[in-house]
From Swiss-Prot:
InterPro entries: Ribosomal_bL12, Ribosomal_bL12_C, Ribosomal_bL12_C/ClpS-like, Ribosomal_bL12_oligo, Ribosomal_bL12_oligo_N_sf
GO molecular function: mRNA binding; structural constituent of ribosome
NCBIfam families: L12 (TIGR00855)
GO cellular component terms, semicolon-separated: cytosolic large ribosomal subunit
Coiled-coil boundaries: none
Subunit structure: Homodimer. Part of the ribosomal stalk of the 50S ribosomal subunit. Forms a multimeric L10(L12)X complex, where L10 forms an elongated spine to which 2 to 4 L12 dimers bind in a sequential fashion. Binds GTP-bound translation factors.
One of the GO biological process terms: translation
Stored PANTHER family: 39S RIBOSOMAL PROTEIN L12, LARGE RIBOSOMAL SUBUNIT PROTEIN BL12M
Pfam families membership: Ribosomal_L12, Ribosomal_L12_N
Keywords: Ribonucleoprotein, Ribosomal protein
Protein name (database record): Large ribosomal subunit protein bL12
Similarity-based family: Belongs to the bacterial ribosomal protein bL12 family.
Role summary: Forms part of the ribosomal stalk which helps the ribosome interact with GTP-bound translation factors. Is thus essential for accurate translation.
Length: 125
């Protein structure tokens, strides 16, 4: 039985950010492509300042290390991401791991503070 394009889109739409990031990695590995956008040299010169300001408005929160108190970190990861217990545990064990993508600076700093309070090491990029 063939799967329709609509069913694929429906399934992808139901994935969490974490699951979607893993799916993108799988596509990159299987097809030998990169999901990073390419920049045309002429456009980079003309819009370089605009691109820099856009990049600074959205941040990714990366769990670099879960530290010694993993249970507390798992609880905070679940609170932040809405993941289930197993998914949150997997996220804390497979570091570095992107927890949130495209968040504003204030939210990224709040998430970082919560995780660091329970002993995790966090990067905001």
């Amino acid at each position: 039985m063939a799967i329709s394009k609509e069913e694929v889109l429906e399934y992808i739409g139901s994935l969490s950010v974490l699951e979607l990031a893993e799916l993108v990695k799988m596509f990159e590995e299987k097809f030998g492509v990169s999901a990073t956008p390419t920049v045309v040299a002429g456009a980079a010169v003309a819009g370089g300042a605009a691109a820099e300001s856009e990049e600074k408005t959205e941040f990714n929160v990366i769990l670099a290390d879960s530290g010694a108190e993993k249970i507390k970190v798992i609880k905070v990861v679940r609170e932040i991401t809405g993941l289930g217990l197993k998914e949150a545990k997997d996220a804390t064990e497979k570091t570095p791991h992107v927890l949130k993508e495209g968040v504003n600076k204030e939210e990224a700093e709040t998430i970082k503070k919560k995780l660091e309070e329970v002993g995790a090491k966090v990067e905001v990029k």
